[in-house]
Swiss-Prot record:
Disulfide bonds: none annotated. This is Flagellar basal body rod protein FlgB. GO terms for biological process: bacterial-type flagellum assembly; bacterial-type flagellum-dependent swarming motility. Pfam families: Flg_bb_rod. PROSITE patterns: FLAGELLA_BB_ROD. Keywords: Bacterial flagellum. It is found in: Bacterial flagellum basal body. Belongs to the flagella basal body rod proteins family. Disruption phenotype: Lack flagella. Altered cell surface properties including greater softness and lower density of the charged groups in the polymer layer. The keyword Signal does not apply. It comes from Bacillus subtilis (strain 168). The keyword Amino-acid biosynthesis does not apply. The basal body constitutes a major portion of the flagellar organelle and consists of a number of rings mounted on a central rod. In Gram-negative bacteria, at least four rings, L, P, S and M are present, whereas Gram-positive bacteria lack the L and P rings. The rod consists of about 26 subunits of FlgG in the distal portion, and FlgB, FlgC and FlgF build up the proximal portion of the rod with about 6 subunits each.
């Protein structure tokens, strides 16, 4: 039996993903005036596919979804199909700032949940004192 029952590890992984997303968003904002810079986005689809493949599923019909493994947990994708500025840059500062705020709220919620788990363990270890 694990002391943390996997919750701490899941929270740690979620914090790592939020950190990666934060870095990509701030990089986009920092390059708002860079000519021909294309905004990047973190895609966790590979991670979702990987986790889905761990599910045990029985395929009883050819139309059912196939579950398969993938190698990487995330990818950073540049969106090169648009340009918002004359210099070829496609960073939308309003969109980036919104995503930054959402990511910060998510990160803070994860940190608070992690603190709650540790406080619960502390209470158990000190006997509620």
């Amino acid at each position: 039996m694990s002391l943390f029952s996997g919750t701490i590890q899941n929270l740690e992984n979620a914090l790592s993903r939020a950190d990666i997303k934060q870095k990509v968003i701030t990089n986009n904002i920092a390059n708002i005036d860079t000519p021909n810079y294309k905004a990047k986005k973190v895609s966790f689809q590979n991670l979702l596919d990987q986790e889905s493949s761990r599910l045990e599923a029985i395929k009883t019909d050819y139309r059912h979804v196939d579950f398969s493994d993938t190698d990487s947990n995330y990818s950073i994708v540049a969106s090169g199909d648009t340009s918002y500025q004359q210099n070829g840059n496609n960073v939308d500062v309003d969109k980036e700032m919104t995503e930054l705020a959402q990511n910060q709220i998510n990160y803070q919620a994860l940190v608070e949940r992690m603190n709650g788990k540790f406080n619960s363990l502390k209470t158990v270890l000190t006997g509620g004192k």
